[in-house]
Amino acid sequence: MVDLPTTTPPAQPTTGNDEVDALHPLKPYRSLENEVLQQRIEAVRQELGDELLILGHHYQQDEVIEHTDLRGDSYQLSEMAAKSQACRTIVFCGVHFMAETADILANRPDRIEARDGRRVDVLLPDMAAGCSMADMAAIAQVEAAWADMSEVIDTEQVIPVTYINSAASLKAFCGRHGGIVCTSSNARAVLEWAFERGQRVFFFPDQHLGRNTALTMDITEEQMPVWDPYALEMGGNTDEQIQSSRVILWKGHCSVHQMFRAEHVDRFRKEHPGIKILVHPECPREVNDIADVSGSTGKIIQTIKNSPAGTKWAIGTELHLVNRLKDEHPEQEIHFLSPVVCMCATMYRIDLTHLCWTLENLRDGRLVNQIRVDEETTKWSLIALERMLAVK
């Protein structure tokens, strides 16, 4: 085990390839046993104390989540980052867009002023931890779609809404155009906010969350055309479809929740009489419509927590979370809804190896994999995020 320095030098951000520029190269960490990695992670946590805040998303592996200070879903983690006070560094055990959001919210002007001008650094243990859904909507595509639809509708009356599972550039787009960010926790409240301010909503990048939420507001499927960014004209729609729309949905989805099917629900109800189906609203409509309960990651956790012993559940969300709920609630019968493994592969990239490597470089004065959003993007993203945080 490496001897810990008696003082912590000021951390310096790296440039270029972080794995090359790091004081401690990544490669030697790959051969360490998990027990050794865990000991070294805890040693750094103890040394840095309140100066370090490790945030973990519920989809993380158990071996990673046990080393986090706070855990939550996208919405909860956004609030945690916004409220950070004493810490100097946030290490985000999640994916890239989450770390971007943490950088924006933790470094709001009022927060920086309260810290006498000091920023909070945000680190992502593995820069390859992205999000396939977020990648389905590039800013150039969204801007092109906005320009195209402006030929047939008044975009001054369109409120753009981006799911928090999106790049900071899309959040900034919403900020510039009077729009807002949403999460699966507050999607309905956000859509209500939007319809108070415009005639239509342009919802991206997850079509399923947008559709499932809008259906609870008496908006019909026919009023929700899907915009395909690769279609030749008008996102694959007629002018009339766009003109008669209430919500224009982006053709994007979560690759995990897309895997769940109505036939999975039917099978469990047939084989396990009395079982309840609990799903995330990122699931397709065919699943969401026939589930007993649909809700955010936070709602899924609370639903299980508040259910009596003996309750039977089949849960349609990320595998690591379902397995953790099963372990934490042995008094209930919990099943994974799909016969196919539905795991967030990019979230899985955050492991003990990368976490230990990140922390020991931080301890010894080097920031690796720092996430820092540029000032212009931060400015407009923050506007959209603050609108979201103000929605009740």
Curated annotation (Swiss-Prot):
The keyword Cell cycle does not apply. It holds the Pfam family NadA. Keywords: 4Fe-4S, Cytoplasm, Iron, Iron-sulfur, Metal-binding, Pyridine nucleotide biosynthesis, Transferase. Pathway: Cofactor biosynthesis; NAD(+) biosynthesis; quinolinate from iminoaspartate: step 1/1. The keyword Iron applies. Residues 1-23 are annotated as: Disordered. GO terms for molecular function: 4 iron, 4 sulfur cluster binding; metal ion binding; quinolinate synthetase A activity. Its EC number is 2.5.1.72. GO terms for biological process: 'de novo' NAD biosynthetic process from L-aspartate. This is Quinolinate synthase. The lineage of its organism: Bacteria, Pseudomonadati, Planctomycetota, Planctomycetia, Pirellulales. The gene is nadA.
